[in-house]
Structure formats: structure tokens, C-alpha cells
Amino acid sequence: MEENKQQTQPASSRPADGKLYLIPSFLGEDNKSIIPDQVKEMVGTLDEFIVENAKTARRYLRAIGFTKNFDTEVVINEIDKHGENIAPKLLANISKGKNIGIISEAGNPCIADPGHELVRYAHSRGIQVVPLVGPSSILLALIASGMNGQQFTFHGYLPIQSADRMKKLRQLEEIARRHNITQIFMETPFRNDSLVRDALQVLDGDTKLCVACDLTLPTESISTKKVSDWKKQVPDLHKRYSIFLLGG
């Protein structure tokens, strides 16, 4: 009988679940004003974060005016240090009423980074996901390219090996030109030049290529030209953050 008296805590007396906030970051440290004040205010209320790199996340938080003590008041978990099936571990405190923020290394979380797995888990558990407004290099490049903004595909990083990359570029070109679907991709800054060389070698001269570099920064440049025109003046993109788009 004593066991029957022991009941689980009524749902009405449990703390409401917290929320998962998706926090935008800079596209480069030369334009810190790009983060809206509303985002800064919201981030200031949080004390638990999921990040790719703790050091750069702390630097970012300080840059936007975050004042809490990282040693005594804040928990920062690096997503890559928790092995497989990480979402239940990293989001456990949400069920206790705590809000948690995901911070990307650049731009918005969950695009070309591992945060999407956490968001997928959050939805499966009925956790509210709140995306905060911030810069997206992909969308900024698209709207400034002059290419089709109604149908487009983002491919992330193309293959590293040159032969595989050129094959992929030909495939993307075929889709862009036959169906007028803008093809968007990116590369790590130190491989930009090799990607451009492959593109100029394998793509048709009439194919349109947009190169968008250093978006939101003082050194920003965005240009859409035919491949034949790019060949006349090959851009130097070494160590510049770039987005590439192909159009028909």
C-alpha cells in the first residue's frame, strides 16, 4: 500500500521545458555590429551553450557584450567531444527548464555544421526551437548573385580530390543550365584557388559563375560573370571566405 501512495510528480508542478536557441555568429570579426541587439539581449540570459570550439565561442560571446563568468556561471559543451548519440546528453537540461543556445563558428547554426542533429532531436522531443536573426553567407550570396532565387540547392563542400570535384562541377552545371536551378557550394579558404582552377577548366564558357567573398566585411566582393570572362582575370581567393554559385 505504501508503494501505491508514492506517485510521480504531477505534470503541472514540473518545470516547463526550456527552449533551444539557434544563435548566429559573425561571418568575420571585422564587422561585429552585424549581430542585432535583440540577439545580444537574448544570449545574455543564457548560461549553457553547445558550440564547435569553446575558445572561439567564448571570444564571440565577449565580443557581443556577454558578461557572465565562464568559470563559475556558464556551461559550454563542445559538440565533437561527446561521441555518438550526443543529443540526449547535450540537451538533457532542457527538460529541467533550462534554455540552451547553439553557436556556430560562423553565420547561422545547422547549415554546413553538426548542429542540425540537435535540432532534429529537439523536434522529436517536442522541444521548442527558436532561430535568432543573423547573417547567412549563403542567402546573402544568393540574393546578390542575380541568379534564380526561387529554385536553388546548397551542396556544402565539394569533393577534395580534383578529378572528383570536376566531375561534381559538371553535374551541377548540367542542373543549373538545363533546369535553371541555382547551385550553391563552398570551400575552405585555403582550397578556394584550386576549386576555381578546376571550375574554369571544366565548365562551359557561357555558364554563369558567382564568387561572393568576405560577406559583410570591409573587403566584401561579389561578382557574377560568365566562365569565359573569369578566365580573363582569375580571382585570388586564398584565405578568403567564399561562396560559389552556378547559374544557367
Q: Could you say what each language-model-derived stretch is?
A:
Residues 117-175:
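Class I SAM-dependent methyltransferase SAM-binding "motif I" and its flanking Rossmann-like core
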